[in-house]
Regions:
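Active-site histidine-anchored catalytic micro-motif
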Residues: 112, 123-130, 155-179, 186-190
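Glycine-rich phosphate/diphosphate-binding loops that line cofactor/substrate pockets in enzymes
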Residues: 134-145, 168-172
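Short beta-strand segments
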Residues: 25, 63, 67, 145-149, ...
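Conserved phosphate- and dinucleotide-binding cores of soluble alpha/beta proteins
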Residues: 174-175, 180-242
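A glycine- and small-aliphatic-rich helix-loop capping segment at beta-alpha/alpha-beta transitions
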Residues: 66-76, 101-105, 159-172, 195, ...
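Long amphipathic alpha-helical segments
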Residues: 13-107
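Small/polar-residue-rich loop-to-helix segments that shape phosphate-bearing ligand pockets
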Residues: 98-141
Length: 242
């Protein structure tokens, strides 16, 4: 994703590994401040998940993978590290999946950094595929609505629900995005709007309760994330999804 800084626009990810440390955007500071924090031990990485420094299931998974990477590099007890990281967010399936994935990879003798980077890249590749498939749904001049944050901040880079929006914008299409504020944590107002602003994508923040009004008034497409998808296609998303 792009981020506007004092030194110009730069490409960043929500979380990555650099020089022996896990580096991430402190999402608690957005949209007022773009701050990067870094950690050199798995305990602090787990705390960054608990205190919502990092958010979004895929980004949480990647953060957990990098936490296990640190544990392996430092020679920590991997079983103890896995249990500690899993306890950081007991309801996050991606966290458990990432920890188990890294445990299996490390037991097979994989390089810790390469294994964690590969896990994060898999998330990005899936997001890019979502963008390719979803971009044709956004027509020239469309009005699009989204809720919560299913963008690059939540998925290491690119995003799920925001992937087609990014792809359409990069392809030169002109459209408008309604971003519902997403109470009580305000992820739409604080995170999704920030991401769109960095890309200069036209948008407006609306109250959650106004979603019905704007849908009646001519929204062409609603793109959402999905916390869970049932076999019959039903899905669950953030509270306030209309």
């Amino acid at each position: 994703m792009k981020a506007k800084t004092e030194n110009g626009v730069r490409d960043v990810k929500a979380v990555w590994f650099e020089e022996g440390r896990v580096v991430m955007i402190d999402q608690r500071k957005l949209p007022r401040e773009l701050k990067f924090v870094s950690f050199d031990n798995y305990q602090d990485v787990a705390e960054s998940i608990s205190n919502m420094t990092t958010r979004g299931a895929p980004s949480i998974g990647a953060t957990a993978a990098y936490g296990m990477c640190l544990a392996a590099l430092k020679g920590n007890d991997l079983e103890k590290a896995a249990a500690f990281i899993k306890a950081a967010r007991p309801t996050a399936y991606d966290l458990f999946y990432a920890v188990d994935h890294m445990t299996d990879a490390l037991e097979r003798g994989a390089d810790p950094i390469e294994a964690a980077d590969a896990y994060a890249q898999t998330i990005i590749d899936k997001c890019l595929a979502i963008g390719r498939h979803g971009e044709p749904l956004i027509k020239e001049g469309a009005k699009v609505m989204t809720h919560c944050n299913a963008g690059a901040l939540a998925t290491v880079d690119v995003g799920t629900a925001l992937a087609p929006i990014r792809a359409a914008h990069e392809g030169g299409k002109h459209f408008f995005v309604y971003v519902s504020e997403t109470r009580p944590r305000l992820q739409g107002m604080q995170l999704t709007s920030w991401e769109l602003l960095q890309e200069d994508i036209d948008h407006a923040i609306i109250p959650d309760g106004a979603s019905g009004h704007f849908l009646r008034d001519g929204v062409d497409l609603v793109i959402l994330g999905a916390d869970r998808i049932a076999a019959n296609g039903d899905f669950a998303n953030k509270i306030g999804t209309f």
